[in-house]
Structures are given as C-alpha cells and as structure tokens.
Amino acid sequence: PRAVRDSEGAGGDRDASGEICDFEEYSWLYHESWRDPDVRWLLSTVPSCMILDDHDLRDDWNSSYAWRREMTAQPWWRDRVIGAFASYFVYQHLGNLAPDELEDNSVYQALRAADSDAERERILSDFAVAADSERGASQWSFKRDFGRVRVVMLDVRASRHLDPADRRVMDSDEWEWTRRACLDADVDHLLIGSSLPAFMLPALHHVEGWNEVVARDRPDKPLTAQVGEWIRLTVDLEHWAAFRNSFDDLVGLLTEVAAGTGAARTDAAGTDVATRRGTPPASILLLGGDVHCSYLEEVELTSPQVADSPTRVHQLVMSPFRNPLQKSIRAVNRLSVRGPVPTLMRRLARAAGVREPAVRWRMACGVRVDNGGMG
C-alpha cells in the first residue's frame, strides 16, 4: 500500500516501509514460515493450538497507551490491522475452535456463505477493523478439554486495557471469561497458556514492576514518565509483571483454583456468591513463550488459603523454534537468576512502591537457549 511506502524515513516505529502489511503479504509469510521442514514435521506430529502475540501484528503491539496512540495515528495502520487479524483468523484462530464453536462463529459462517472472493475480503476486513477498535468485537482466548485436563489459552495482547492509571493485560470482560474458564474446570490438571511468561526471571520481574511505576504518565513528573516509556519500549518490558494489577489478579486466581474455590454464581437475589468446586486440581501448569529461551520454574503460592492445598504449580517457558538471543541478553538472563542482582532489583521495585506478591518461584531447569523441548 502507498501509505506503507510513504512511511519510509518517518523515523522510529512510524517507518513501516520494510515490513509486511496486507493480507496477501501475511499469507506469503505464513507460507514461508510453515514450509520449513522442521516446522512442518512439528505441526504434523504434535497437536497444536495457537495464540497471537505482538509480532502477529507489530513489534511492541499494545505495549502502552502512548505506543498505541502514536501507531493508530499512522496512515498505514488500518491496512496493517486488516492484514494481521484477517490472516490470523484464517491461518491460526479457526484451528483453535471446536466444531460446535465453528458452527456458532458468525464470521466463519458468513465466509462460508459468501458468493465471491470480494465479499469474503469485505467480511474479513470489517471484522479485523472492529477487532482492533471495538471492545467485545472479537475473542481470541479459548479453552479446550482433553479428558480430565483443561487448557485455557489467554489473549494478552489484543484485549489489553492501557489506561496508564490502571494498566492490565486483559480488559474486564476478558478477565471474567478467564476466571470462569479456570474456576469452572472440574479437572485433574489445569494448563493456562499465555504468549507472555507470568513469572519472569527474578531480576527482570522486579525491573518490570519498577518501570511500570516510573513510566506512569503523571503531570508532576512528565520527564520521568517519558524516560520510563523509552526504557519500556527499548528493553521490551511488557510482560505480566509490567501490568502489576493483572499479575496480582493472576496470582489471586491461581490461589482460588488451588484452594478449590469455584466460579461465582448468581443467587436468587442477584448477588454473586462463591461456590465450592470440591477437590482442587493436582497441578496447574502455566505455559509461556516470547523470551527466546526455555526454562522451568516451581511456583509457591504463599496465601494461608492454600497452606494445605495438594496442588503443585509450575511454569514452563519454551521456544521450540526460537529466534537468536544475543550474548548480551544471555548474560543478563544469567545475572537475573542468581547473585546480588535479583535482590538489588527487588529493593528498587519496593522503593518505587511495588507491592510484595503472594507468591514465590524458583528456577528448576534452565535457562536453555537451544531449540527443542524441555526434558
């Protein structure tokens, strides 16, 4: 598109001249990525479900209110949104849905009923624009049950709430869906998938919490906020720990699941009341990616509510096919796990007013930077 070509030389994230944009170019990228023999073998032998992250649309997508305000003002943004969401819907999201969910999916049914390619293109374009600009127009999160195992896959990109005073990786509707999907599960094992790790390497976790406070847009400290925003985008501080309200909500949800608390139901008076689901699951496994390396963590929930819970909690962060990780970042990862750095970063976060979480975690295996699974 001309708007993309004209962005050359605009500077910073405004220059999209060397990037893909429309549906056709995204289709080429899927073809190029998935034709690799190793990728084809993996997808043909291992059942898969998928969830979008920033590079499905653009690097740093929805990292902050300031980022979104600048990007949505660019003349090429609409074409980018259409290409990204339309291709993701076709190539990835439809494969996440069960047959009954496909029957109930209005966009899918409209595409099947369309008489021409032009009509299908219009349907996908309208859907993509609405998915980006209208709350509730789409839901990318989904759940799957495999016997006594439930997988809950979370969209932590498209549904973000970016108000600087109350940043969250999900808006209230998406979070309520997440709670019900986890608390309604009468299962032995609960898997919660998120493109972003919930529990970062310790020092990085504390840095993200500190940065969120510093980058908060406040009239009394505009320069501090600008510097904090620059750090956030430069170092990619955009995981759960950088959205502390959501991180605390997640820890609270894990605690409820481990305690055997069921989802809220409405009584005859219209009041939400908690129900008991009974025996909590034997395990909760959080799945994450994004960070170009792999590691396994043991997670300990510290609330008295789960003092006697049998539920074991782990997080597995994995990149079966990962992008290269510079030696400098590998060194940062090593420093983030042991020695004085995590302690110093924790003190920095506490000095900024970041709350102590009701959870602890430790590295059980990793950090690995090679391709493949964790054994």
Regions found by a protein language model. Name each.
Residues 1-375:
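Metal-dependent phosphoester/phosphodiester hydrolase catalytic core
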